[in-house]
A protein has these predicted regions:
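Histidine-acidic metal/acid-base catalytic patches
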Residues: 2-3, 8-16, 29-33, 56-65, ...
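Glycine-rich anion/phosphate-binding loops
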Residues: 43-58
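Extended recognition/assembly regions associated with phosphoester-bond processing machinery
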Residues: 51, 81-82
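Active-site groove signature of glycoside hydrolases
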Residues: 62-79, 103-106
């Protein structure tokens, strides 16, 4: 399954494609039939008000598949793990009651760039993981996946993040090993996370061709 991540303040949608709606870009909760799930706004999850915000989002997206969240803003190195787990447990229990899968995303820097931290939190609160390929160096991707594989629900697909920008693949030479491994662990939801429409469509075309040949 291939989806397109909506990452625009204008809130564009592809009427004929599955969409992951980025509330961190456009906070309006749109409920079109082709929207599978949502990416939450970036919040300080140590604060109780963030619990209220996430529960309100979940209440409003009932009937959709998942909500992906960041554990922090990408720079935090010191995390109050106990309070983080306490707050996320409340959010995840509410998500489960509403049949929404809560997914935590690995980031390029900070606490959740460490796969051991990600899997510890996911196991502790019994939630899922959004595996962001481009947030992980090429030579660490398979190791990261191996540690987190039991909890991965979906993946963000693009070449790599550099200087805060998601780069598109020119081909799938670098992505094929991790795409193979994701399919091997039954992660079949590839969400293309790019900003440029032409880059999105070109990447989608390459992934479609790749999926025809995967064995």
């Amino acid at each position: 399954m291939i989806g397109i991540c909506m990452r625009s303040k204008k809130g564009y949608t592809f009427n004929n494609k599955l969409v992951d709606w980025g509330l961190h870009y456009n906070p309006k909760i749109v409920k079109k039939n082709n929207i599978m799930g949502y990416h939450a706004p970036i919040l300080n999850l140590i604060k109780k008000e963030s619990v209220f915000i996430l529960k309100n989002i979940i209440e409003n997206i009932k009937g959709k598949d998942y909500l992906t969240i960041h554990l922090h803003n990408g720079k935090n190195k010191d995390i109050d793990k106990e309070l983080l787990i306490e707050n996320l447990s409340i959010v995840n229990e509410f998500a489960i009651k509403n049949n929404v899968k809560l997914c935590i995303e690995n980031l390029r820097e900070g606490f959740s760039s460490n796969p051991k931290n990600i899997i510890e939190i996911a196991d502790e609160i019994n939630c899922f993981i959004t595996f962001d390929i481009g947030h992980i160096p090429y030579n660490k991707r398979l190791e990261f996946l191996d540690i987190c594989s039991d909890r991965i629900y979906n993946s963000h697909v693009y070449e790599i993040e550099m200087n805060g920008k998601h780069l598109p693949p020119k081909n799938l030479n670098n992505l094929k090993p991790i795409l193979d491994a994701l399919l091997d662990v039954k992660c079949k939801m590839f969400l293309i996370e790019l900003m440029d429409i032409n880059e999105i469509l070109n990447t989608e075309k390459m992934i479609k061709e790749y999926l025809k040949t995967y064995k």
